């Protein structure tokens, strides 16, 4: 589209002033496709100065715009974006938020570990991130979630063990293996 071509041409000389001018026009754009293009462009440009605008778009009722904002927030980074993305782990766009967090540039480990105290859906999504980042300091929480009443959380916790367990957890892993149900043995052996 012409809009995308114009944004691409502007990328050469884009700076915080241009980002601010474009973001200021965002509310006046008539359709969500145009807003989605602008939000995606801000994310692709890593427009840190417009993190607030991008994060606000996460709450859009338009699913495409919300998903574009989630992806853009992941590219922009920063604590505010991290908090907004972690909050989405229990929302309708949890899959998109998980993908953005998996590629998040920064230091999200503490936020991922803290998300293990969230709702069951947040816990299940955070367990995957904790394992992928190999956050061994979250091992105690992961072991505790093996006892969760929620089946999805329990399954995610067993899957996460391979990413968070360290040699100091050998005894606990052996105890789990002795007591494990057949379905859980494969996850423990990983």
Which residue ranges define each predicted feature?
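Residue-level detector of extended alpha-helical repeat arrays and alpha-solenoid scaffolds
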Residues: 3, 19, 35, 66, ...
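Amphipathic alpha-helical scaffolding segments comprising HEAT/armadillo-like alpha-solenoid repeats
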Residues: 1-4, 15-28, 35-36, 47-59, ...
């Amino acid at each position: 589209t012409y809009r995308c071509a114009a944004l691409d041409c502007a990328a050469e000389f884009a700076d915080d002033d241009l980002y601010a001018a474009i973001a200021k026009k965002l509310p006046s754009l008539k359709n969500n496709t145009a807003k989605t293009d602008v939000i995606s462009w801000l994310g692709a440009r890593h427009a840190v100065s417009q993190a607030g605008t991008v994060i606000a778009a996460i709450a859009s009722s338009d699913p495409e715009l919300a998903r574009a904002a989630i992806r853009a927030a992941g590219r922009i980074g920063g604590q505010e974006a991290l908090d907004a993305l972690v909050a989405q782990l229990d929302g309708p766009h949890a899959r998109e938020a998980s993908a953005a967090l998996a590629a998040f540039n920064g230091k999200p480990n503490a936020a991922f570990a803290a998300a293990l105290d969230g709702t069951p859906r947040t816990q299940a999504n955070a367990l995957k991130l904790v394992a992928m980042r190999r956050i061994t300091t979250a091992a105690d929480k992961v072991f505790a979630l093996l006892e969760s009443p929620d089946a999805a959380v329990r399954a995610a916790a067993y899957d996460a063990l391979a990413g968070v367990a360290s040699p100091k957890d050998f005894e606990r892993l052996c105890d789990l293996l002795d007591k494990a149900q057949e379905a859980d043995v494969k996850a423990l052996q990983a």
